[in-house]
């Protein structure tokens, strides 16, 4: 990884939609970055976001890449591999919103390109940082079982990808982080399509080679917003409701129930951008969610969609 960069870094955002706007704002707030450029094929949208922050909108991605030191890619998921590859080949450290890509082959190519060009590749799995401040990622024993659900009403966003890649991929990453180096030996999947051309609601269950069991549900066509996780260990159970903000722990593990009072809990996106920037500047050993982790989540999501007949 190249750590010869100096602060402030010139930051650019590819994708001027909702999440592109969020990332642009985080670069404006970060003392180690200066937001410099916006690229979006929709020139009017790119110009609107650029005007909001007083920066330049580009209509050609090559010129955009010449104007920046680091890149966030927050364009539609199906474009992540192409845009990521262009930025990495230009020698730019890249933070790609989830999913890292939409196929395992694409994701692995991005990881290879980052290694080849010795630049940081990060993924937008910022909830890892929340688990860090909770203390969950510090537990050395893998859980016996994880159950998680992530549901919300239809928003009309991210219809280019399935709910597996849109929402469930977050919990896949978190679950793989806790379960560790183990393979999913069994997998069953159910899902339905209502509002898009891919899965809008899905559930999966898997058993891993270390005995851990995983059950996930994700929906973007639910009546209400629900998000929670139950992690079962031999020592007890951890129950988290991220909407109601409740936290129960019967395990005896030293965890932080006040995680929402931490900077990471209040602003996980900002914390993830900051960690990415610190990695580029050589102040951190790597991003919170490196490309390899994003690729692992993509490969699992791809397997789930294949099992659902997608």
Q: Which role fits each region the language model picked out?
A:
Residues 155-224, 292:
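Rossmann-like dinucleotide-binding domain that binds NAD(P)(H)
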Residues 23, 42, 53-111:
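Beta-loop-alpha module in the N-terminal Rossmann-like domain of NAD(P)-dependent dehydrogenases
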Residues 101-158:
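A contiguous active-site-proximal alpha/beta segment in oxidoreductase catalytic domains
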Residues 1-53:
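N-terminal Rossmann-like dinucleotide-binding module
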Residues 59, 96, 121-123, 240:
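Hydrophobic residues in well-ordered beta-strands that form the structural core
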Residues 1-4, 63, 70-73, 209, ...:
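C-terminal helix-rich "cap/oligomerization" subdomain common to oxidoreductases
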Residues 194-195, 210-272:
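NAD(P)-dinucleotide binding in Rossmann-like oxidoreductases
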């Amino acid at each position: 990884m190249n750590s010869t960069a100096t602060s402030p870094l010139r930051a650019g955002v590819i994708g001027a939609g909702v999440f592109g706007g969020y990332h642009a704002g985080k670069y404006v707030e970060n003392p180690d970055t200066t937001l410099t450029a916006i690229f979006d094929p929709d020139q009017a949208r790119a110009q609107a976001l650029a005007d909001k922050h007083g920066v330049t909108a580009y209509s050609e991605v090559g010129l955009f890449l010449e104007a920046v030191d680091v890149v966030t890619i927050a364009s539609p998921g199906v474009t992540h591999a192409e845009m990521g590859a262009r930025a990495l080949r230009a020698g730019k450290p890249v933070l790609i919103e989830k999913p890292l890509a939409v196929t395992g082959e694409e994701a692995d190519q991005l990881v290879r390109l980052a290694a080849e060009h010795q630049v940081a590749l990060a993924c937008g799995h910022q909830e890892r940082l929340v688990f860090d401040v909770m203390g969950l990622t510090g537990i050395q024993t893998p859980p016996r079982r994880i159950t998680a659900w992530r549901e919300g009403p239809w928003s009309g966003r991210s219809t280019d990808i399935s709910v597996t890649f849109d929402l469930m991929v977050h919990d896949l990453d978190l679950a793989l982080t806790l379960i560790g180096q183990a393979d999913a030996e069994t997998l069953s999947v159910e899902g339905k399509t209502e509002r898009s051309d891919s899965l809008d609601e899905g559930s999966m269950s898997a058993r891993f080679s270390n005995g851990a069991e995983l059950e996930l549900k994700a929906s973007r066509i639910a009546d209400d917003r629900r998000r929670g996780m139950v992690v079962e260990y031999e020592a007890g159970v951890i129950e988290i409701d991220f909407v109601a903000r409740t936290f129960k722990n019967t395990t005896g593990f030293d965890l932080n129930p006040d995680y929402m009072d931490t900077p990471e809990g209040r602003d996980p996106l900002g914390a993830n951008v900051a960690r990415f920037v610190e990695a580029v500047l050589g102040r951190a050993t790597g991003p919170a969610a490196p490309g390899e982790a994003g690729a692992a989540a993509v490969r699992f999501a791809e397997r789930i969609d294949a099992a659902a007949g997608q």
